[in-house]
Amino acid sequence: MRLPGRHVLYALSAVTMLAACSSNGARGGIASTNMNPTNPPATAETATVSPTPAPQSARTETWINLQVGDCLADLPPADLSRITVTIVDCATAHSAEVYLRAPVAVDAAVVSMANRDCAAGFAPYTGQSVDTSPYSVAYLIDSHQDRTGADPTPSTVICLLQPANGQLLTGSARR
């Protein structure tokens, strides 16, 4: 499948033989209420103020652990000499957004399969056709290398959207 020039799909692939490391740090926020001790409420009822969620701070993650909806400040280099990426809140400037994770077979057609899956998953996530959108598509392939043949789709394609003009995104492309 060929897409217009600005929507060229490219792959960054790697054989990932290491265990995936993930940080499960708890996120917390600070809630405050404005209480005036000199003027207590006239009734026994007290007002409750819902805490404002703290903005999600940037975190480092291995790219094989990326999830749909993650926004990336940076992409791993094509040679995959770095296996981590910085995930940021989508409201901040970012270079790419994950819109699909899909299992794929590892064979000679892996690139064709990744192209097909990423193209098919684009419209359901963004509400737009890849051909008429302001985005280009890229993907990463996590090759689990199940050599037993027990898993017919041992790899995962991680589809990313990026601005076709090379600028940064602000906000999510999810519809």
UniProtKB/Swiss-Prot annotation:
<feature type="region of interest" description="Prevents bacterial uptake by a human macrophage-like cell line">
    <location>
        <begin position="121"/>
        <end position="140"/>
    </location>
</feature>
<comment type="function">
    <text>Probably involved in bacterial recognition and uptake by its host (human).</text>
</comment>
<keyword id="KW-0472">Membrane</keyword>
<feature type="region of interest" description="Disordered">
    <location>
        <begin position="31"/>
        <end position="56"/>
    </location>
</feature>
<feature type="region of interest" description="Prevents bacterial uptake by a human macrophage-like cell line">
    <location>
        <begin position="61"/>
        <end position="80"/>
    </location>
</feature>
<keyword id="KW-0449">Lipoprotein</keyword>
<feature type="lipid moiety-binding region" description="N-palmitoyl cysteine">
    <location>
        <position position="21"/>
    </location>
</feature>
<protein>
    <recommendedName>
        <fullName>Putative lipoprotein LppN</fullName>
    </recommendedName>
</protein>
<feature type="region of interest" description="Prevents bacterial uptake by a human macrophage-like cell line">
    <location>
        <begin position="101"/>
        <end position="120"/>
    </location>
</feature>
<keyword id="KW-0564">Palmitate</keyword>
<feature type="lipid moiety-binding region" description="S-diacylglycerol cysteine">
    <location>
        <position position="21"/>
    </location>
</feature>
<keyword id="KW-1003">Cell membrane</keyword>
<dbReference type="GO" id="GO:0005886">
    <property type="term" value="C:plasma membrane"/>
</dbReference>
<feature type="signal peptide">
    <location>
        <begin position="1"/>
        <end position="20"/>
    </location>
</feature>
<keyword id="KW-0732">Signal</keyword>
<feature type="compositionally biased region" description="Low complexity">
    <location>
        <begin position="33"/>
        <end position="48"/>
    </location>
</feature>
<dbReference type="GO" id="GO:0009986">
    <property type="term" value="C:cell surface"/>
</dbReference>
